[in-house]
Amino acid sequence: MKIRPLVPAVAAAALCLPLAGGAADNPKFSRNEILIGVLTDMSGPYASLTGEGDVAAAQLAIDEFGGKIHGVPIKLVSADHQQKADVSSARAREWIDRDGMDLITGLGQSALGLAVQGLASSKKVITMNTGAGSPDLTGSQCAKYGIHYSWNTHAVAVGTAAAVVDGGGKSWFFVAADYTFGKSLQDQATKVIESKGGKVLGGVRAPLGTSDFSSFLLQAQGSKAQVIGLANAGSDTLNALKQANEFGIVKGGQKVAALLMFITDVHALGLPVAQGLQFTT
C-alpha cells in the first residue's frame, strides 16, 4: 500500500491524543481504551489522497507509540464517509453515543468536516480535520473541541493566485467544485487576483466526482481568460487536467492553475499531461 500525501497528518492526529491524556494523573478513557475513529473517503474522488492510506498510517502511528498510553490500549476503527455530510454525522453520532469515541480524524471534505466538528464538539469529543480545507473550521464555525490540522483554502489559493498574477496571468476563469471547499477556494483566490489588479471573467461549478469536464472546460476556453483556475482536488482535478490536455488548452495559449495539487497528482498525470501546469505545493 502506498502512503499518500495527507497520511502523515492523520498519523499526527493519533499521536496528539497523548497530550490530552497526559494532562491528568489518572486519565479516563471510554471503556478503558483509547478509541480513535478515522472517517475518510474510501471510494470517492479523494480516496487516493486519504482512504486506506489514512487508516494504515494512523495504525503505524499507534504501533510506533507502543499501542498504549498510560497503560491504556489504543484501538483504531474506520469508516467510509461516502462524501455525504448526513452519512458522516450519523456515523460520528453512533461512534460517540454507542462506542464512546475519544477522537475522530480524517474528514477530508469541508461540508462534512464542519458537520462532524459541530456534532462532536457539542458532545465534548475532539475532532481533528486533516483534509478539509474550509477556513470556517477555525473561523465562523470554530469549535472548542475542533482541531484543524495542515492547510486551508486561504493558504493554498493565495499562494498560487498571487504567483500566477505576478507572472502575468491577469484574467481568470474558474472551474470550481460545487460545494463549500470549491467556493471557498475560488473566493479566496478572487480576492488576491483583484487586489493585484487582475480580473475574474467568470466561473462554473462542477459537481463533486465529475468525470466529464468537457462542457466546463469549453466555457473556460471560450472566456478567453489568460488563466483557467481549477478550484477542486483529487480525481476531479486529475480528470479536468487530462481533458484540458486533450482540448489543447495550454498549447492554445491559456494557462491552467491548480489551486490544490500534490506531487503524487503530477506522477499520476505524467509529464506530457502535467507540463505547463501552474501550482504551488
Ranges and model annotations:
Residues A90, P135-D136, A143-F247:
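Extracellular/periplasmic Venus flytrap/periplasmic-binding protein
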Residues N32-G51, S171-V175:
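Short beta-strand segments enriched in small/hydrophobic residues
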Residues A244-T281:
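Extracellular/periplasmic periplasmic-binding protein-like sensory domains
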Residues F65-G71, S122-V125, I193-K199, E246-G253, ...:
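Short helix-capping segments at alpha-helix termini
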Residues M1-L35:
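Short, low-complexity disordered leader/linker segments with a strong preference
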Residues A24, F29, E33-L35, S48-D54, ...:
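Beta-alpha junction/loop-to-helix N-cap segments that form part of ligand/metal-binding clefts
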Residues P45-A56, T180-S184:
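Glycine- and acidic-residue-enriched helix-capping/strand-helix junction motifs
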Residues K75-A79, L201, Q278:
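General small-molecule cofactor/ligand-binding pocket signal
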